[in-house]
């Protein structure tokens, strides 16, 4: 079966390290394709009264660009560099096709920094050119200054699009280091502020976030046996919740965090099971011919999964209590994830990331990279992160859901795979 061959290939990668090297310890975004045709916007360099540990405007610019919705203009093309709304000359920007400008200041405040911004209407869409569309002021500790910039991005993005921003989110991923160890890491969505959650001499696979962002479930091969671990990120406590006979893999939290869906082959074929997220007796949901794996939950509580029951892997949907399954991803498809609004299914098809519109039934190929795997959608459905093969290594890739913006996150000291996008976070 093709699905079995694919799973065996993935396991082979886990146990045999491929020699590759990356210069940096952290992943960093490298732009592959810009945002031609996206909405122009300007983020003016923020005024400051001294040294600031991060360029606030640069972070906001990158966030808006990464969404694929905006095309921020370069600083050297700006007709002026105002620090406040009162200094903005609307006509100077409107003549360039810029209908909104972000201006602001960063000032030292006690042991932290105060970030203040204003979003200015330059064309009178609000009824008054020069009007302030949104503004805020926040004080952050030095270590949270990038988080503060992401908050500004979230507020600007939501005001301009009506969609909640997802720049204050993180990604979990696995790094198989060149030295042979395996690390589960977390970083801000753009690759900054990386830290190691756990490391092991044995493989780690398939991290999955709880809906509150407080826990990660993942597959560990400690004791050379696959088992599911739930890791509390606040306390650091780790609990093995599944060490059943056979392979235990592909954990996924239910929308309320109370249950885990996972795959197990204790009966010979892979099937989908559900159990309490703290462990307990599992309930088998699938059966019959074929392998069933890679469960993921929709917001309304259904389970998507990959099955080769028809001869090749395809994405199906079923109730969380089991029963009949409905084919929703035609052709050769796997690793399905539904957007939170239920309108978009993202999956791998033909070894590339594909977006499927559940309303119209139309599909769009979003990636052009090689051997794509493990797509994960941002909580607002605007961006997708996945892993792909580059040369002899695995790297992370970022693509906007409209396909306009594409980037790599290659900077690491080993193979980077199994990315998982967090839910909305507070910090």
From Swiss-Prot:
The Tol-Pal system is composed of five core proteins: the inner membrane proteins TolA, TolQ and TolR, the periplasmic protein TolB and the outer membrane protein Pal. They form a network linking the inner and outer membranes and the peptidoglycan layer. Residues 1-23 form the signal peptide. It comes from the Bacteria. Keywords: Cell cycle, Cell division, Periplasm, Signal. Belongs to the TolB family. Part of the Tol-Pal system, which plays a role in outer membrane invagination during cell division and is important for maintaining outer membrane integrity. This is Tol-Pal system protein TolB.
């Amino acid at each position: 079966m093709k699905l079995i061959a694919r799973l065996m290939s993935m396991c082979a990668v886990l146990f045999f390290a491929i020699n590759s090297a990356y210069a940096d310890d952290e992943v960093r975004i490298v732009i592959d394709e810009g945002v031609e045709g996206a909405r122009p916007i300007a983020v003016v360099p923020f005024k400051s009264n001294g040294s600031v540990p991060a360029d606030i405007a640069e972070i906001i610019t990158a966030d808006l660009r990464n969404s694929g919705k905006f095309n921020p203009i370069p600083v050297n093309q700006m007709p002026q560099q105002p620090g406040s709304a009162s200094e903005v000359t609307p006509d100077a920007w409107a003549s360039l096709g810029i209908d909104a400008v972000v201006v602001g200041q960063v000032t030292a405040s006690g042991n932290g920094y105060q970030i203040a911004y204003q979003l200015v209407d330059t064309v009178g869409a609000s009824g008054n050119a020069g009007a302030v569309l949104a503004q805020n002021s926040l004080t952050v500790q030095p270590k949270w200054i990038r988080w503060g910039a992401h908050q500004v991005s979230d507020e600007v993005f939501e005001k301009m699009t009506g969609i909640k921003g997802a720049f204050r989110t993180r990604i979990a991923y696995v790094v198989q280091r060149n030295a042979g160890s395996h690390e589960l890491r977390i970083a801000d969505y753009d690759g900054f502020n990386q830290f190691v959650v756990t490391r092991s001499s044995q493989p780690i696979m398939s991290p999955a976030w709880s809906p509150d962002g407080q826990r990660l479930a993942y597959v560990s091969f400690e004791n050379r046996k696959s088992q599911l671990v739930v890791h509390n990120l606040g306390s650091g406590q780790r609990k093995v919740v599944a060490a059943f006979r056979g392979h235990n893999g592909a954990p996924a939290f239910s929308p309320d965090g109370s249950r885990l869906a996972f795959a197990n082959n204790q009966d010979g074929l892979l099937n989908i099971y559900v159990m309490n997220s703290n462990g307990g007796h599992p309930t088998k949901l699938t059966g019959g011919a074929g392998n069933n794996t890679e469960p993921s939950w929709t917001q309304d509580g259904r389970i998507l999964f990959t099955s080769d029951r028809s001869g090749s892997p395809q994405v199906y949907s079923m109730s969380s209590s089991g029963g009949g399954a409905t084919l929703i991803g035609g052709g050769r498809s796997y690793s399905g994830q539904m957007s939170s609004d239920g309108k978009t299914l993202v999956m791998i098809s033909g070894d590339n990331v594909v977006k499927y519109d559940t309303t119209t039934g139309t599909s769009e190929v979003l990636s052009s990279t090689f051997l794509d795997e493990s797509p994960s959608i941002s909580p607002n459905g605007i961006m997708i992160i996945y892993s792909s093969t580059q040369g002899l290594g695995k790297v992370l890739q970022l693509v906007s859901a409209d396909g306009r913006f594409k980037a790599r996150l290659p900077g690491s000291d080993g193979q980077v795979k199994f990315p998982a996008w967090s839910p909305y976070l507070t910090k």
